[in-house]
UniProtKB/Swiss-Prot annotation:
It catalyses: (6R)-NADHX = (6S)-NADHX; (6R)-NADPHX = (6S)-NADPHX. This is NAD(P)H-hydrate epimerase. Belongs to the NnrE/AIBP family. NCBIfam families: yjeF_nterm. It comes from Rhodopirellula baltica (strain DSM 10527 / NCIMB 13988 / SH1).
Length: 244
């Protein structure tokens, strides 16, 4: 087989998977509570463990990051909850794609719980560099990077940001890197679009399952940038229940 054929195959396979993995049914904008209901029903009614939903979300986000920003190293900001767990998952898939990845975490791996702890331990075992937030952010800057991914706080958080989270977001906003938010920009209320004094300013927001109703509010686009919806792989029947 010629080198030309070999080099063409990965791109062909990825493009084919992009077509195959797009759900045939797209959900309308939803409140954060409705999204939590989808997660709960996927786990309870359809027997999908939360770690599978996180894996699906993380892999889908990593694939889209590869398309949106195919060059450069990646810094992923990981909070203590499931949004951070998504970030740890993304890091592993980007590493598999050959990207240079570093994680800046709000807590040590042994302080995390649940699915986020599992994904953090996998990332750590995979040799991904994980640095707990420290002096670099206190000095008002992040480690040098081309792309910064916001996996700090998810839909359960409400503005205003305080303490170390505010410091990290301010440092990210001061960076010249491409900024990508996971699910929702940290510092934004996903239902109202309300933002505090400090809110992550994304060039792209990769939101899971469905757009959030707050993204449609006046002024929200200044923080979300372009919004992309990532499937979390829930069954079609569940999508049908929430599409009306």
């Amino acid at each position: 087989m010629s080198p030309e054929v070999l080099s063409a195959r990965p791109g062909f396979v990825r493009n084919l998977m992009d077509v195959m993995m797009k759900p045939v049914l797209q959900l309308p904008p939803m409140t954060c509570q409705r999204i939590r209901e989808i997660d709960s029903l996927a786990m309870e009614q359809f027997q999908m463990p939360g770690i599978i939903l996180m894996e699906n979300a993380g892999r889908g986000a990593a694939e889209l990051i590869e398309e949106l920003a195919p060059e450069g190293n990646v810094l992923i900001l990981c909070g203590k909850g499931n949004n951070g767990g998504d970030g740890f998952t993304i890091a592993r898939h980007l590493q598999l794609a050959g990207r240079e990845v570093m994680i800046l975490a709000m807590a040590a791996t042994n302080e995390l719980q649940g699915d986020a702890a599992i994904q953090a331990k996998i990332a750590e075992a995979a040799g991904i560099k994980i640095q707990v937030v420290g002096e670099a952010v206190e000095a008002g800057r992040l480690p040098a990077t081309d792309i910064v991914v916001d996996g700090l706080l998810g839909t359960g958080a409400k503005p205003p940001l305080r303490g170390r989270y505010a410091e990290v977001v301010e440092a990210a906003n001061a960076s010249s890197a491409i900024r990508i938010a996971l699910d929702i920009p940290t510092g934004m209320n996903g239902d109202t679009g309300e933002t505090g004094e400090t809110t992550f300013r994304a060039d792209h927001t990769l939101t899971f399952a469905a757009p959030k109703v707050g993204f449609e509010k006046l002024g929200a686009a200044r923080f979300t940038g372009e919004v992309h919806v990532i499937s979390i792989g829930v069954p079609l029947e569940l999508l049908r229940q929430f599409s009306v």
